[in-house]
From Swiss-Prot:
<dbReference type="InterPro" id="IPR008775">
    <property type="entry name" value="Phytyl_CoA_dOase-like"/>
</dbReference>
<comment type="similarity">
    <text>Belongs to the PhyH family.</text>
</comment>
<protein>
    <recommendedName>
        <fullName>Dioxygenase lolE2</fullName>
        <ecNumber>1.14.11.-</ecNumber>
    </recommendedName>
</protein>
<comment type="pathway">
    <text>Alkaloid biosynthesis.</text>
</comment>
<keyword id="KW-0560">Oxidoreductase</keyword>
<feature type="binding site">
    <location>
        <position position="127"/>
    </location>
    <ligand>
        <name>Fe cation</name>
    </ligand>
</feature>
<feature type="binding site">
    <location>
        <position position="203"/>
    </location>
    <ligand>
        <name>Fe cation</name>
    </ligand>
</feature>
<dbReference type="GO" id="GO:0051213">
    <property type="term" value="F:dioxygenase activity"/>
</dbReference>
<comment type="subunit">
    <text>Homodimer.</text>
</comment>
<keyword id="KW-0223">Dioxygenase</keyword>
<feature type="binding site">
    <location>
        <position position="125"/>
    </location>
    <ligand>
        <name>Fe cation</name>
    </ligand>
</feature>
<dbReference type="GO" id="GO:0009820">
    <property type="term" value="P:alkaloid metabolic process"/>
</dbReference>
<comment type="function">
    <text>Dioxygenase; part of the gene cluster that mediates the biosynthesis of loline alkaloids, potent insecticidal agents composed of a pyrrolizidine ring system and an uncommon ether bridge linking carbons 2 and 7. Lolines are structurally differentiated by the various modifications of the L-amino group and include norloline, loline, N-methylloline, N-acetylloline, N-acetylnorloline, and N-formylloline.</text>
</comment>
<keyword id="KW-0408">Iron</keyword>
<dbReference type="GO" id="GO:0046872">
    <property type="term" value="F:metal ion binding"/>
</dbReference>
<dbReference type="Pfam" id="PF05721">
    <property type="entry name" value="PhyH"/>
</dbReference>
<keyword id="KW-0017">Alkaloid metabolism</keyword>
Length: 256
């Protein structure tokens, strides 16, 4: 990976070395500096949680578990919430990521993952296959809005797996043979912490077995500066091939 070229006060040489070796980095709020008031972030997320099924705007995705219809994710939200747009695509996150990777980048996916009580987990997988037709390489920031614990289904990583090219089976999961002997490490986070990782990290999630939400804000960034409009193309494609609950009344004018 390219050495860092844009120093950030919260990212040390040891952090860069850890990220390169392990494929992820945890930073507390006082180190990353993406926002100065956790309570404000939580208010922003509370506002978005009340958004309805308006059409042609943000995208709400739901899951059904144990007979309950639960909000799972809200995507394409930046246009409709200025503070969240700055948090995800402003100078601060881009400077932080450049200090870690040495690369400039552009956001192409923005969302909140809600992980409500009873929310489902996810089998071991990589994020790369889901987005590779748009961005073969990318990096993600996950900002913990609530505490992330083993009990409420925090992310679990296999450190260093980004270097191993984990094989993917026909159903999109990591091949079972590769998983033998691998240890998944829980990414326990305090509210306000960030977790940064790349497209090739092997990870899984357990269900949320508590009575508390485990929300996080996500920004996903690609490195091809010649495609500043990739986000528009991505969401036009996603509207057709992975439509949200409020998609049936959206007007789709883009080509797949």
């Amino acid at each position: 990976m390219t050495a860092a070229s844009s120093p950030h006060p919260g990212v040390s040489a040891e952090d860069i070395e850890f990220y390169q070796a392990n494929g992820y980095l945890r930073l507390p709020q006082e180190a990353h500096g993406l926002f100065d008031d956790l309570a404000k972030l939580q208010v922003w997320v509370a506002e978005i949680s009340q958004w309805g099924l308006e059409t042609g705007k943000w995208r709400h995705y739901y899951e059904t578990t144990n007979g309950k219809h639960l909000l799972w994710g809200t995507e394409k939200l930046m246009e409709y919430h200025a503070p969240m747009q700055d948090l995800i695509s402003g100078e601060a996150p881009l400077a932080l990521l450049k200090s870690l990777t040495g690369k400039d980048m552009v956001v192409f996916k923005d969302e909140i993952g809600w992980k409500l009580p009873g929310g489902k987990g996810a089998v071991p997988h990589l994020d790369r296959p889901a987005y590779s037709m748009f961005a073969p390489e990318f990096i993600e920031i996950m900002i913990a809005v609530d505490a992330h614990t083993v009990e409420n289904g925090c992310l679990q990583f296999v450190p260093g797996s980004h270097k191993e090219a984990a094989p993917i089976s026909a159903d999109g999961r990591i091949a079972s043979a590769w998983l033998e002997g691998k240890e998944f490490i829980p990414m326990v986070l305090d509210p306000g912490d960030v977790l940064i990782f790349n497209e090739s990290m092997a990870h899984r999630l357990e269900p949320n077995k508590t009575d508390q939400r485990r929300a996080a804000v996500f920004g996903t960034y690609h490195f091809d500066l010649s495609q500043p409009d990739l986000r528009d193309k991505f969401y036009a494609h996603r509207l057709i091939h992975s439509p949200p609950e409020n998609a049936w009344v959206e007007k789709v004018g883009a080509q797949t």
